Amino acid sequence: RDNYNSIDAYNKFNTDTELAYGSSFTSIYKLYMEAQVNYARKFGKHDVTGMMLYMQNDYRNKAELAERYQGIVGRVTYGYDDRYLFEFNAGYNGSENFMKGKRFGFFPSVSVGWRITNEEFMKGTQDWLNNLKLRASYGQVGNDIYKIGGAKQRFLYEQKWNQIGNDYRYGETWQSGIYESQYPNYGVTWERAHKYNLGLEFGLWNGLLSGNLDLFYEKRNDILTQYLTRPQWVGVAMAAANLGKTKNSGYEIELKHANHIGKDFNYTVGLTYSHAKNEILMMDEPDLKTDYRKREGHPINQYFGLVCDGFITQADIDGGKLPVSKLGENVGIGDLKYRDM
């Protein structure tokens, strides 16, 4: 994709310059390569499938360095008599954001399922119970992207330098200079999430009522985040590091009713309810920070602030137990009364 912009500009009258012409263009190229092999075979009560995929992505902006990603993905599934189901997936992904030796990460996942309604002992329920399936899964997911203000931060393992204007004087003239803006992190690598799921599916009366119940748990390790305990005397910003740990757990319930009125009108009604709770297990905080100010042990994006105990009354003022205001003004009747923490 090419974007062209040109400007014709006339200079101010009586200036000793010629007509100026300027042009600029940017070119963006994206090259994506993918090769895939599939396998499928059924014999007797056995059903086996397999897939292997290789991908490579090259994104180039004329004004920037190319972004490159590479990966291999594989999947194997096995089913026996449409009762016992097994699936294994694995990804081996590479990212340019990490230095050699840490660029590639291996992320496996496995799932099993049991279609109970296809068992011999369930044949007496097939007229009203059409589907009953129990499933469980475990998998790992990686993340290599770290952003500040929505901007992706690349090459966390590289030292960064910026130019600054009028930094020092040489004689009577101010000169520009350069300074180190980021200290590299040679050990940074993939952020990794471990996900667990246990689910139950059911279907009643030929689809009149169906639903799912899922229990999930996720623990995320090596979260890419900034240092918060960097001493000021260091003088240089530190690149992001694998400093954080969180957990997330909960459940989700889904119910659906499907039916028809006559031959031409079909309708579906659904209800979904979910509950989730997360917690910060570890982050880069000062060791001497008071407990009520620490974010460890609290939910992500937990609000921190003063606790209001109502409004100040005349009885509070007469009692003389109000704390002294730190805002430069004396408190009065009707002001918010904050709890002494």
Region locations from a protein language model:
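Residue-level marker of intrinsically disordered, low-complexity segments enriched
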Residues: G71-V73, N259, L322, E329, ...
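Extracellular/periplasmic, surface-exposed regions of secreted and cell-surface proteins
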Residues: R1-V307
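C-terminal segments of large proteins
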Residues: G305-V307, F311, A315-L322, V331
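Intrinsically disordered, low-complexity regions of eukaryotic proteins
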Residues: G203, E254, F311, D318-G320, ...
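Short alpha-helical "patches" and their helix-cap loops
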Residues: E218-K219, G320, K326
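Charged, glycine/proline-rich intrinsically disordered loops and linkers
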Residues: R1-N14, V324-D340
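Helix N-terminus capping/helix-initiation residues
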Residues: R115, G297, T313-A315, G334
